């Protein structure tokens, strides 16, 4: 049976750990606000790009943009997985990595050769341990732009037939939802429908759409609809990967705050039990 000195030492140890987890919780809470602002600022652009692309496609020949065409046979796919560099975030990384692995195995069972692009040390380490060498590793907007070129060129040249991105969407400060988005061929499901926006995000998007009311009547394209659509397609691909980075970063901080709050609560409960 532990004596009084042992109990006191245990209380001090738990209290010290609680101070660390409480500090990490507060840091994560501060980072959530900044990350959420970046996501909110990027959301109208993300939605507008996909809306404009779908609208412009109506004015261009059906075969004007190869990225809008569905390949008859799916032989090769690219799965882009967005995780984090650090742990201590509950099931944030494990959920997205397990889902990505499930998607990869499902495609392989269908006879599809799968390439993996990974964002975050956790994703890179997870797949490397399983003998899967990512064909692309990225963590910045510049690298996301390079990945978009790789995906776009691969699809145009017939080297890729499908492109997916898997990441955690920050539904709110306390909740993250898993997103599996088909990037190519372009999915006409809107970002709002895909992500299941919360009321605050819906208000931001609605205000933006009120300010940017669509033009009435015929639309003239310079130099032509095909050129505009080609530019929009490049912007769409860049944005798809970059938005996933922003959204995942906000979700990571929310998951870390939840994990640290749970650890702090457990520490308080243990101290109460020991005293």
Regions found by a protein language model. Give the residues of each.
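C-terminal beta-strand-loop-alpha-helix "lid" module of Rossmann-like NAD(P)-dependent dehydrogenases
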Residues: 1-275
């Amino acid at each position: 049976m532990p004596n009084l000195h042992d109990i006191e030492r245990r209380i001090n140890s738990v209290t010290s750990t609680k101070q660390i987890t409480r500090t990490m919780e507060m840091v994560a809470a501060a980072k959530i606000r900044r990350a959420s602002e970046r996501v909110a600022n990027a959301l109208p652009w993300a939605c507008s790009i996909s809306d404009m692309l779908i609208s412009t496609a109506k004015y261009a020949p059906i075969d004007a943009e190869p990225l809008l065409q569905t390949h008859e046979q799916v032989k090769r796919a690219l799965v882009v997985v967005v995780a984090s560099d650090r742990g201590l975030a509950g099931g944030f990384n494990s959920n997205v990595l397990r889902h990505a692995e499930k998607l990869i195995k499902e495609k392989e069972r269908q006879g599809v050769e799968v390439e993996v692009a990974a964002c975050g040390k956790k994703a890179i380490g997870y797949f490397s341990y399983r003998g899967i060498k990512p064909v692309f590793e990225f963590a910045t907007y510049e690298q996301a732009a390079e990945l978009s070129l790789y995906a776009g060129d691969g699809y145009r040249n017939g080297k890729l037939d499908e492109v997916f991105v898997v990441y955690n969407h920050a539904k709110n400060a306390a909740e993250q939802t898993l997103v599996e988005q088909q990037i190519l061929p372009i999915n006409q499901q809107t970002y709002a429908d895909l992500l299941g926006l919360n009321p605050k995000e819906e208000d931001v998007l609605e205000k933006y759409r009120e300010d940017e009311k669509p033009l009435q009547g015929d639309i003239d394209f310079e130099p032509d609809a095909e050129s505009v659509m080609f530019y929009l397609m490049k912007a769409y691909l860049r944005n798809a990967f970059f938005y996933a980075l922003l959204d995942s970063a906000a979700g990571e901080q929310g998951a870390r705050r939840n994990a640290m709050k749970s650890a702090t609560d457990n520490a308080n409960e243990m101290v109460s039990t020991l005293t």
